[in-house]
């Protein structure tokens, strides 16, 4: 069956190459620049580009604000997060901006317009208050009712299923949802936004300022409504009751998206009142949301840290197109590096741990908090005390909130820093929150990656917490472990922990040469290209080193960091954890999830209990977590 007209975008097959369509406008600006010998500041072609950029930034501003959960968590209308399904559905949310820019370009380039200056004011006329008055009048008397009745029509069969249903695909709105729609809906919005401008221009009172002001104010209010965060105090409506019929709120719009049979207005609820479609719960719910009654304490917390400056921008409140895919050094982020560097200095001086993202698993709220410290800072001796204080504050805060389990990420559980979390458990024996380093499951993931026919392995980082557990586990399986360490004392201490009949399988080596015939390398310490050359062709590098080693050898294979895929029934997950694929989390994160799901009452800190490796692994599989 053929798709209904104006239900799909003509440039859908172009993907990101759709932005080439802006080329004609860019070329016109460049041509005028060449002819004038200077920037064409009085060019409508230039204004089209500037307006497009300003509009995109408006939506991005509200999107970023709405996803700064450390600011907005308590005032979110729908507390759930956006999932990958919604991210993909709204990927081309800016199609309407492209459409309206092309319509504007057609208008500017029209011979009739160029000849008669129809609709286009003099560029010297930057401001005319009469134009603003006319535009406001036309917005209230024409644009608002036009949108209201068209919107109601789109909610009737068959228009809803053919055109508008996709816009209602999710109950969690974001400013990007505002732009997501079919060409028909976008053309309708173009008419709605254009009527006040056209009226003012035809009456000879248009201005450049009116174009920018009207369009950007329209986008600002639309983004605000879709932000899913209450920003207007209920006291304002109590002081001026009439105002509730003149401006909508995010709660007002959210009710429309969830219930679909009320609150159809553009910005002014008075049209719902006149049309009999006003949801009278709107302002009571708005008050509850603004006062934080919609807030919920998490059940599980994963306490992460920032890796580096580029990775600091891989968060849900920067660019969703980046944070919803595995981390990479996207070129679009490079211009913002100085800004990110400034924020690093600011966080070093005066920040505390903050909420980054959340998801739900089987009705329980899981959150990721971040310690405001970067990877390099963990190796500065003078910073050790401050980092531990940040981690301790996070643990105590979680304890007060009633969190059941808090899992420590990567460097937050460094042995030299806090003994794998033992520092906090010993200092606060009365903790109700269970502190978990997650390394038991990390060890299990690494061990279960090793083929069953392997007879010997080469282990770097051999005397670390993970290295010790891996060595002791493998020797019980009668697998010879070449443990790279210069410390005979630390090696012998680990060897004595093994049962007497298996101690012979633990072998100390101090150089890489003994491993040149071993094709299974377990990497717990960084390997340089020179050190990797000792591995024979066909070697597989299993990794538990942060950051992971760089794969220089083309004749070898490189494993990723230990990770597990969350169960299929996870909800509201729309953020990739660092370099992990969608739906995949680091094994230490997954270890905390398993600890919570099992309801275990013990802290998992300090040395890894080798006897629990298989127990934790089986529990993870039982709950639906799978190897990534």
Curated annotation (Swiss-Prot):
The keyword Repressor does not apply. It catalyses: a long-chain fatty aldehyde + 2 NADPH + O2 + H(+) = a long-chain alkane + formate + 2 NADP(+) + H2O. The chain crosses the membrane at residues 37-57, 131-151, 191-211, 299-319, 331-351. Coiled coil: none annotated. It comes from the Eukaryota. GO terms for molecular function: aldehyde oxygenase (deformylating) activity; iron ion binding; oxidoreductase activity. The keyword Mitochondrion does not apply. Its EC number is 4.1.99.5. GO terms for biological process: aldehyde biosynthetic process; alkane biosynthetic process; response to abscisic acid; response to water deprivation; wax biosynthetic process. Residues 137-277 form the Fatty acid hydroxylase domain. SUPFAM superfamilies: NAD(P)-binding Rossmann-fold domains. Keywords: Endoplasmic reticulum, Lyase, Membrane, NADP, Transmembrane, Transmembrane helix. Belongs to the sterol desaturase family. Aldehyde decarbonylase involved in the conversion of aldehydes to alkanes. Core component of a very-long-chain alkane synthesis complex. This is Very-long-chain aldehyde decarbonylase GL1-2.
């Amino acid at each position: 069956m053929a798709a209904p007209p104006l239900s799909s975008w003509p440039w859908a097959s172009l993907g990101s190459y759709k932005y080439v369509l802006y080329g004609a406008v860019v070329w016109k600006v460049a041509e005028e620049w060449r002819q004038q010998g200077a920037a064409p500041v009085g060019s409508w072609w230039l204004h089209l580009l500037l307006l497009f950029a300003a509009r995109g930034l408006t939506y991005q501003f509200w999107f970023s604000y709405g996803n700064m959960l450390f600011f907005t968590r308590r005032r979110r209308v729908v507390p759930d997060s956006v999932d990958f399904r919604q991210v993909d559905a709204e990927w081309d949310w800016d199609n309407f901006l492209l459409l309206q820019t092309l319509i504007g370009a057609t208008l500017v380039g029209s011979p009739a317009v160029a000849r008669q200056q129809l609709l286009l004011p003099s560029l010297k006329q930057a401001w005319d208050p009469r134009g603003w008055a006319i535009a406001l009048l036309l917005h209230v008397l024409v644009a608002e009712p036009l949108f209201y009745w068209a919107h109601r029509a789109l909610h009737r069969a068959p228009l809803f299923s053919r055109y508008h249903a996709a816009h209602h695909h999710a109950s969690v709105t974001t400013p990007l949802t505002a732009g997501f729609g079919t060409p028909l809906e976008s053309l309708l919005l173009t008419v709605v936004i254009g009527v006040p401008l056209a009226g003012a221009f035809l009456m000879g009172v248009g201005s450049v300022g009116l174009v920018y002001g009207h369009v950007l104010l329209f986008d600002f209010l639309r983004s605000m409504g879709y932000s899913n965060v209450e920003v207007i105090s209920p006291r304002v409506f109590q002081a001026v009751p009439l105002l509730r019929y003149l401006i909508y709120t995010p709660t007002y719009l959210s009710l429309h998206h969830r219930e679909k049979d009320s609150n159809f207005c553009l910005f002014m609820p008075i049209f719902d009142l006149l049309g009999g479609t006003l949801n009278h719960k709107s302002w009571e719910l708005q008050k509850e949301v603004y006062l934080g009654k919609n807030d919920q304490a998490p059940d599980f917390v994963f306490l992460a840290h920032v890796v580096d400056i580029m990775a600091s921008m891989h968060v849900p409140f920067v660019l969703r197109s980046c944070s919803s895919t595995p981390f990479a050094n996207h070129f679009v982020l490079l211009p913002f590096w100085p800004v990110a560097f400034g924020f690093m200095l600011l966080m070093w001086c005066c920040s505390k741990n903050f909420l980054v993202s959340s998801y739900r698993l089987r009705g329980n709220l899981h959150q990721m908090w971040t310690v405001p410290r970067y990877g390099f800072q963990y190796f500065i001796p003078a910073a050790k005390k401050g980092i531990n204080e940040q981690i301790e504050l996070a643990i105590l805060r979680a304890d007060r909130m009633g969190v059941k389990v808090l899992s420590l990420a990567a460097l937050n559980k460094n042995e030299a820093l806090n003994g794998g979390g033992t520092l906090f458990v010993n200092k606060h024996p009365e903790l109700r929150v269970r502190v978990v380093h997650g390394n038991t499951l990390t060890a299990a993931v690494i061990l279960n990656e090793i083929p069953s026919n392997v007879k010997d392995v080469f282990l770097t980082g051999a005397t670390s917490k993970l290295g010790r557990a891996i060595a002791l586990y493998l020797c019980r399986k009668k697998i010879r472990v070449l443990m790279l360490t210069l410390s005979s004392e630390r090696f012998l201490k680990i060897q004595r922990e093994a049962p007497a009949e298996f101690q012979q399988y633990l072998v100390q080596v101090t150089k890489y040469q003994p491993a040149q015939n071993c094709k299974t390398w377990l990497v717990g310490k960084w390997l340089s290209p020179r050190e990797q050359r000792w591995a024979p062709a066909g070697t597989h590098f299993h990794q538990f080193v942060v950051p992971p080693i760089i794969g220089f050898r083309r004749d070898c294979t490189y494993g990723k960091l230990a990770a597990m895929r969350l169960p299929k029934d996870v909800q509201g997950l729309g953020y990739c954890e660092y370099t992990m694929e969608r739906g995949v989390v680091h094994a230490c994160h997954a270890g905390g999830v398993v600890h919570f799901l099992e309801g275990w009452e013990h802290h998992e800190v300090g040395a890894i209990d080798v006897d629990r490796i298989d127990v934790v692994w089986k529990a993870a599989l039982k709950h639906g977590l799978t190897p990534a």
